[in-house]
């Protein structure tokens, strides 16, 4: 995928030829009722090549244990556990580091640098371990490169970072635990009887048996709150199944074609899946990464999804690019996933049906397309000319959707509506 700086015209005359203003911002773009694009293609990262060596099994370190891990350099990314990270590395130091890693436990550290208003890199206090599951080494024109697919595993806190004689940084980290909060109603003696048969209503007759059983169990369990000093709605705020149902409802508003079967059933894995696909800035994402409880993480994600209504250009902050109603999934990962371009830049890309206030740079290209069958065109903010992402256009007439936008998360800023008295909403939401 291209970078906007490499395709800028050299003079004003060429700029007039290459610059195209998106002049259909006001038109209503109908969402296609059927998406016939194979959503498994983006998850395979086929642009990296099909002959990669794959590894099986997974490496998990003991919670609270201290580990020494090599640090992934030159990649500014807050990795979420469970998130896929594709990489293309060219520097000899990096190639050597990962060549050694694949013969060991294949695990490295991805540091989560907190954002700094001045633009300088700050000291990272947290991060995520990543494990390589596919690897390919190649040589072209005398230059060695490695292509990697890795996945985030566990959160950690940074204790110390030291640079070795070969220039590779080693991080001493402590693996952070996942706190499983006990069910506050589990102590009630009659709770095991909640699976008893209940009469079916017209609604329950059309509900799948497994989902109906779960709903009945949850409703009856919360009904037991009448035996305590707190009302049921208080317990529902901290019930993992209730929170997951509320989040799924929001996700279905984003993507009508979303299937619940494609989502994790474990609250922890589910909360991480949602965190990885939320189009939020680094400040909010880092706050989510610090949370050690799936229930609290889900509560914060709900707050974010409820209150963030639109996405603006991060650079000029006043230019609205798209709204959450335009978000949809064109990948099994969800509406947003990480991809890497031929130059090694990793972009977390959000797919939306419609975007506004953008200019297109250059001509469409299918080279290294992250979505096979679509050509990409670089998109810039119309106000400040910041790189915002790409417009994807189908190269075949029968491909649906015929066009969409891929917006890079690093260029977006979620908009928090003002309060009743005109006061801007808190950027930290429920955190």
Curated annotation (Swiss-Prot):
Which residues are in the Lon N-terminal domain? 69-309
Knockout phenotype, as recorded, reads: Specific defects in fin and otic vesicle development.
Start and end residues of each CULT domain: 308-416
Tell me the Gene Ontology biological-process terms attached to this UniProt entry: cell population proliferation; embryonic pectoral fin morphogenesis; fin development; limb development; otic vesicle development; otic vesicle morphogenesis; proteasome-mediated ubiquitin-dependent protein catabolic process; protein ubiquitination
Which residues are involved in binding (S)-thalidomide?
368, 370, 376
Q: What is this protein called?
A: Protein cereblon
**Region of interest called Disordered, as start-end residue ranges on this chain:** 1-36
Q: Provide the protein's localization.
A: Cytoplasm; Nucleus
**SMART domains according to UniProt:** LON (SM00464)
Give an example GO cellular component term for this record: nucleus
Q: What does this protein do?
A: Substrate recognition component of a DCX (DDB1-CUL4-X-box) E3 protein ligase complex that mediates the ubiquitination and subsequent proteasomal degradation of target proteins, such as MEIS2. Normal degradation of key regulatory proteins is required for normal limb outgrowth and expression of the fibroblast growth factor FGF8. Maintains presynaptic glutamate release and consequently cognitive functions, such as memory and learning, by negatively regulating large-conductance calcium-activated potassium (BK) channels in excitatory neurons.
Assembly and partners are described as: Component of a DCX (DDB1-CUL4-X-box) protein ligase complex.
The entry lists its GO molecular-function terms as: metal ion binding
Tissues in which the UniProt entry reports expression: Highly expressed in brain, head, vasculature otic vesicles and developing pectoral fins.
Q: What else is known?
A: Thalidomide is teratogenic in human, chicken and zebrafish, but not in mice. Binding of thalidomide and related drugs changes the substrate specificity of the human DCX (DDB1-CUL4-X-box) E3 protein ligase complex, leading to decreased degradation of endogenous target proteins and increased degradation of other proteins that are not normal substrates. This is probably the underlying cause of the teratogenic activity of thalidomide, possibly due to abnormal regulation of the BMP and FGF8 signaling pathways.
A Pfam family matched by this chain, by name?
Answer: LON_substr_bdg
State the similarity comment. Answer: Belongs to the CRBN family.
Output compositional bias ranges, type Acidic residues.
10-28
From the UniProt record, report the name of the gene that encodes this protein. crbn
Which organism's genome codes for this protein? Danio rerio (Zebrafish)
Q: Which residues bind Zn(2+)?
A: 313, 316, 381, 384
Provide this UniProt record's keywords sorted from A to Z: Cytoplasm, Metal-binding, Nucleus, Ubl conjugation pathway, Zinc
The annotated pathway is: Protein modification; protein ubiquitination
**Impact reported for residue 376 to A:** Abolishes thalidomide-binding
């Amino acid at each position: 995928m291209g970078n906007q700086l490499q395709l800028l015209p050299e003079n004003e005359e060429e700029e007039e030829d290459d610059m195209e203003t998106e002049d259909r911002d006001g038109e209503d773009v109908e969402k296609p009722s059927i998406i016939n694009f194979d959503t498994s293609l983006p998850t395979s990262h086929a642009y990296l090549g099909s002959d990669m060596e794959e590894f099986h099994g997974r490496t998990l370190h003991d919670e609270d244990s201290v580990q020494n891990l090599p640090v992934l350099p030159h990649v500014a990314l807050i990795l979420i556990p469970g998130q896929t990270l594709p990489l293309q590395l060219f520097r000899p130091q990096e190639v050597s580091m990962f060549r050694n890693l694949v013969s060991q436990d294949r695990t490295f550290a991805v540091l989560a640098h907190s954002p700094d208003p001045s633009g300088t890199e700050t000291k990272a206090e947290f991060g995520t371990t990543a494990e390589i599951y596919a690897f390919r080494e190649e040589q072209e024109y005398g230059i060695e490169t490695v292509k990697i697919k890795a996945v985030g595993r566990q959160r950690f806190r940074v204790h110390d970072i030291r640079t070795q004689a070969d220039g590779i940084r080693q991080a001493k980290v402590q693996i952070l635990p996942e706190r499983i909060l006990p069910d506050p109603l589990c102590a009630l003696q009659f709770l095991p009887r909640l699976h008893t048969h209940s009469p079916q209503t017209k609604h329950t007759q059309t509900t799948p048996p497994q989902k109906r059983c779960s709903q009945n169990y949850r409703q009856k369990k919360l009904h037991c709150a009448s035996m305590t000093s707190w009302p049921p709605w208080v317990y529902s705020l901290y019930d993992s199944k209730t929170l997951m149902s509320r989040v799924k409802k929001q996700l279905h508003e984003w993507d009508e074609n979303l299937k619940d079967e494609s989502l994790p059933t474990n609250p922890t894995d589910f909360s991480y899946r949602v965190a990885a696909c939320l189009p939020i800035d680094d400040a909010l994402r880092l706050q989510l990464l610090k949370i050690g409880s799936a229930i609290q993480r889900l509560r914060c994600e709900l707050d974010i999804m409820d209150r963030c209504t639109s996405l603006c250009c991060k650079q000029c902050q006043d230019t609205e690019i798209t709204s959450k109603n335009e978000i949809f999934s064109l990948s099994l990962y969800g509406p947003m996933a990480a991809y890497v371009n031929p130059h090694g830049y990793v972009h977390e890309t959000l797919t939306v049906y419609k975007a506004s206030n953008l200019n297109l740079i250059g001509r469409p290209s299918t080279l290294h397309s992250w979505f096979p069958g679509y050509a990409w065109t670089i998109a810039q903010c119309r106000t400040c000319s910041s790189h915002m992402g790409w417009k994807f256009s189908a190269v075949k007439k029968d491909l649906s959707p015929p066009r969409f936008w891929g917006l890079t998360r690093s260029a977006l800023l979620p908009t928090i509506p003002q309060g009743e008295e005109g006061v801007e909403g808190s950027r930290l939401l429920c955190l």
